[in-house]
């Protein structure tokens, strides 16, 4: 397995990461409910092949993915680089409506208090006292970038996160976060040979800021694994 630094940090991550959307269960995350044993087997395979980068999010199964990972990581937390997300929550404490699913209303809130509460909730669900990386799940233009950056920097100083990034964003968002004093280590965007999106523009900005461009959907949900 090849490794690289996560942006400007000293964090070594495998160039392949494990996304744990499928652990969430429910109506959309996968076709079955996962167990702790499923999560443990995933981590075993990752370890076997040298994958140390694990990605999840609070809304994957409305907390389920994080909880299963937390239990599966007991006794082996230091073997993996753990990345989760903030901004999407189901606490009904404000923010912008994002979606309704499985009886929950999910809002998008990038204000300081919401970001910090998201991190505290993730730490609790996963049974750890720090996160290696936290990603703003959906960049939101309704709230000041400076406020979000300030909250993320506070969390770094407090030792609760090591670094942070963006997802579902535009190249202009990366520039705005950097100009607001942010230190964006990673951007996570949908990208494939069928859906190049704004990859080229993002690639140039990532080079400028030494930010890792992390992709999801590269196999188009399995379509690109079949003969053409």
Where are these regions (language model features)?
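A short, structured active-site edge motif that brings together acidic residues
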Residues: 79-91
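Conserved, mostly hydrophobic/aromatic
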Residues: 6, 18, 46, 54, ...
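Short, acidic/polar
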Residues: 32-46, 108-126, 170-175
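Beta/alpha (TIM)-barrel catalytic core signal, keyed to glycine-rich beta->alpha loops juxtaposed to Asp/Glu
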Residues: 3, 139-228
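Glycine-rich, positively charged active-site loop/lid region within alpha/beta enzyme cores that binds
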Residues: 12-14, 22-28, 92-104, 205-228
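Active-site groove signature of glycoside hydrolases
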Residues: 123-142
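N-terminal binding-site loop/beta-alpha segment at the start of enzyme catalytic domains
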Residues: 1-81
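A structural motif
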Residues: 51, 128-131, 161, 184
């Amino acid at each position: 397995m090849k490794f690289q630094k996560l942006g400007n940090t000293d964090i070594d991550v495998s160039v392949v990461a494990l996304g744990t959307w499928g652990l969430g269960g429910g109506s959309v995350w996968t076709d079955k409910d996962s167990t702790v044993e499923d999560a443990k087997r995933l981590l075993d395979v990752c370890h076997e092949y040298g994958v140390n980068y694990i990605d999840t999010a609070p809304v994957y199964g409305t907390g389920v993915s994080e909880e299963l990972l937390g239990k599966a990581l007991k006794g082996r937390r230091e073997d993996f680089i753990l990345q989760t997300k903030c901004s999407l929550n189901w606490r009904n404490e404000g923010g912008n409506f994002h979606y309704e699913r499985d009886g929950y209303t999910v809002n998008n809130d990038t204000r300081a208090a919401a970001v910090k509460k998201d991190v505290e909730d993730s730490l609790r669900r996963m049974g750890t006292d720090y996160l290696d990386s936290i990603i703003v799940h959906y960049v939101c233009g309704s709230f000041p970038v400076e406020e979000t950056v300030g909250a993320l920097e506070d969390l770094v100083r407090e030792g609760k996160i090591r670094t942070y990034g963006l997802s579902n964003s535009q190249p202009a968002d990366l520039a705005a976060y950097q100009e607001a004093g942010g230190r964006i280590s990673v951007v996570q965007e949908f990208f494939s040979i069928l859906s190049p999106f704004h990859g080229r523009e993002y690639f140039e900005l990532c080079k400028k800021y030494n930010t890792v461009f992390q992709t999801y959907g590269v196999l188009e949900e399995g379509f690109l694994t079949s003969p053409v």
